[in-house]
Every structure is written in C-alpha cells, then in structure tokens.
Amino acid sequence: MEKRHFMATHTWVSDEARDQLLAATSGMSDKDFFASLKTENAETLAHWMGQGDFFFCHWYATDANAIFESLEASGMNDLIVTMPSEMQRYISCEKTSGQILINPFNADPSTDG
C-alpha cells in the first residue's frame, strides 16, 4: 500500500504521562527519535513541541492505523492521545516543483496539477 502524508495532533493523557515520556526521551538524539517511530508502514518526518498541551508530527504512513501501530510499538500510545488527519495537499519550500496545487476537495485528484 502506498504511503500518504498525515498531520497528527497529539496531547498527553496526563501530566504524569508527559513527565514520564519526556524523562524517557531526555537523552535521545533527533536521529534516535525518528528511528524509534519508523516502521514498514509509518514514519515520522517532522515533529513540533512547545510548552502547550498539544504537539504535532508529520507522518508518512499507509493509513492512520499504521501511525497507531508505530506509537504502540514505541510504547508511546498509552501516554498520548493522537488525532491523525490525512493531508492530500503536501508542499514544502524545501522541495518545490512548479506544479499546480492539489485541491483536496476535488473529487478526481488526477485532474489536479
């Protein structure tokens, strides 16, 4: 199955869960972080976390269930609540092509650029 882009909104199940996960990852490098979440069907491409209740990840996965399977395998799924949302339009200033933007509401995306 082909992988697709997802944005996931995450939050902690509790303050204790937040403290537990942050302690467990305190000595982890960025490479270790991405490797710990990579499976055959899902991988994290980017991660944003501030001091608020929510944090965000860009996932490349076959489906939303593959994201939950990756989180379960890493031991994180019991510590966070996750809402993955598939994004039909994914563009990045780091990789531009000049193609017409995909309209995610188009019933036939093959007619988009």
Question: What are these model-derived regions, one by one?
Answer:
Residues W48-M49, Y60:
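Well-ordered beta-strand positions
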Residues S36-L37, Y60-C93:
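An amphipathic, aromatic/His-enriched active-site/gating alpha helix that lines ligand/cofactor pockets
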Residues M1-T44, G50-F54, N65, Q88-G113:
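Short S/T/G/P-rich N-terminal loop/turn motif that feeds into the first structured element of a domain
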